[in-house]
């Protein structure tokens, strides 16, 4: 029986904890929004930020809202792909920054997918944050997905180290 490398366990636990935290916070804030917000009376928070209840049948930031069944299928595939990639990244020893980004991305994807599949909103995701008037409403999961994707991209682009050449290739 082979042992699981400690770096994999640590990264897997960190990734799972971050993803679980995102899911918990996102689902709690969506529940709060459903019980406390209206779609017709935005609640001013600070500066250009308002809270207003909306239901998004599209992808993040309401993209593709007219093709809900396609979005549901793509969201499901994307969530599975992100989780598979996250597991692989943890297994091969991805940097802690990449693990954090993947945890945010995984948690956001899974939470929005849970909304689509198990929520009472006919395949829609609950959105409630309006940062500026010209930008679509979003939720904590959307923010986590965006932050996670940017974190992973920046980390891989700016901080990834090239692999050392094999001695025979020098």
Predicted regions and their residues:
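Alpha-helical transmembrane bundles and membrane-interface segments of multipass inner-membrane proteins
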Residues: 1-170
